[in-house]
Every structure is written in structure tokens, then in C-alpha cells.
């Protein structure tokens, strides 16, 4: 999804909100296209239906890391999971698994982000589990 939404409850946007957004260059000229995208995704809970698999696989990734005693950096209910890896485990995993560094917390701790999607396969999660088992 390409876009962000600002929600005001009770239809009460702050005074001059849209003027300030425009003035600071934060309003896209083609905003209608993004609006159509948001409208479509939130009609009949389509967004939640298509993201269900990604969130379920991310939850399983979290469980796999917890099973192997790896610290979860942030509580994330989304398709992204953040874990704390040692430099040694980071190096070993980065040879076999796609993920990215989110933050170098210290010389001994690296927070890494693992992201799932509609295309994430259970076999890939099983492989992650096997890889971590080998380093336990």
C-alpha cells in the first residue's frame, strides 16, 4: 500500500489542517488515486482478509524465535517482527534468510526486522526453525 491516512473522530479536523498539509508539501497531487485504494481496501474488510496470512505467519515467526530463546525487541501485531540477535547469529542467519537490520542497539545486540507477506510459505518458516535449531 502506498499512502498514509489521518483519522479524525467526529469529523472534526483541526482548523486549517488541509491548508497546513498542502503548505508543507505533504499532500499529493494525485491523492484521489490513493483515496480509491483506501476505499477499496477497507470495503468489506478486504485489507484484513488479504493480510490475515501475513499476520499469521509473522506470529509463527515470533513463536519460532521465542522457542529458541531469542528476545523479541518490540511487541508487533503486524506482519513485521523485530528480534534481538547477537552479531554471530546475525551473520549466520544472513547467509540463509532474507531480513534487515533495524537498529544496532550495541556491539552485542542487533535488532532485526523480519517481514512476511501473502506469499510467505510454511516451508520457509520450517526452514527458519531448522536453521535456528542448528545454532542452539
Predicted regions and their residues:
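Conserved C-terminal alpha-helix-loop-beta "cap" of PLP-dependent enzymes
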Residues: 59, 64-134
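Active-site C-terminal subdomain of aminotransferase-like
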Residues: 1-78, 85
